[in-house]
Design a protein with these regions (language model features):
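Conserved AAA+ ATPase core "coupling" helix
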Residues: 151-172
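Conserved catalytic/switch belt of AAA+ P-loop NTPases
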Residues: 110-115
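Walker B catalytic acidic pair
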Residues: 98, 124
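Short basic (Lys/Arg) and small-residue
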Residues: 144
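Loop/turn-to-beta-strand initiation segments
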Residues: 91-93, 116-123
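Conserved P-loop
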Residues: 2-88, 128-139, 149-152, 173-174, ...
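Conserved ATPase-coupling elements of RecA-like P-loop NTPase cores
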Residues: 99-109, 129-134
């Protein structure tokens, strides 16, 4: 029995070049899934180039590293156009971890790479700590052929977690706090919709269910 991902992959292989997005909250295994796909392609002798934003230096500066400490070598890039220093005509696969930390020009770049026959695999947060769409991620997901949305486990109740809880001095962050703040388990948690808290977050709608 084939998964829907495997079926789509077989169909896409008939034509070279497409975009895959792996998204979800922190601790959902996004980097782990990206590394799994990269490792499978390495076994197939594909020519792969892996990138991550220089901003993300939590575990290593020249490797993509998951929370489980699985890793692969990567290039740090400060700007999206830096990928062209390393991607060549004979590159088969381009993988980018934590793509949400790059500038928005990465959208046009990865579309160009896919049009040029590259398989592009990216991972990133689909929402920020406020549970709002993260930067250009909605546009990226709309342009991709394959979108894999992962969930974590809520640290409070054990339900499927779709949100990233930012903790500051032991308390939930405020809505107007900076969006980008690199951290790991000491500053973020996975939470479900009902356990996720943001101080002073505007309520978009006040209903009156009866």
């Amino acid at each position: 029995m084939y998964t829907i991902y495997e079926v789509i992959h077989v169909v896409l292989k008939q034509k070279e070049g497409w975009i895959e997005v792996i998204c979800g909250p922190m601790f959902a295994g996004k980097t782990e899934e990206l590394l799994r796909r990269v490792k499978r392609l390495e076994y197939a002798k594909a020519n792969i180039v892996v990138f991550k934003p220089a901003l993300d230096d939590r575990y290593a500066t020249s490797e993509v590293v998951s929370h489980n400490q699985n890793r692969t070598e990567s290039y740090n890039i400060h700007e999206s156009h830096d990928v062209f220093k390393y991607v060549k005509k004979d590159t088969d696969v381009v993988a980018i971890d934590e793509i949400q930390f790059l500038d928005e020009s990465i959208l046009e770049i990865i579309e160009y790479l896919a049009d040029e026959g590259k398989r592009v695999i990216v991972s990133g947060l689909d929402t920020d700590f406020r549970a709002e769409p993260f930067s250009f991620m909605p546009k990226l997901m709309a342009k991709a052929e394959i979108v894999t949305k992962l969930t974590a486990v809520c640290v409070k109740c054990g339900a499927p977690a779709t949100r990233t809880q930012r903790i500051v001095d032991g308390k939930p962050a405020k809505y107007l706090d900076p969006i980008v703040l690199i951290g790991a388990s000491e500053s973020y948690e996975a939470r479900c919709r009902h356990c996720h808290k943001v101080y002073r977050k505007p309520k978009p709608y006040q209903g009156n269910l009866r």
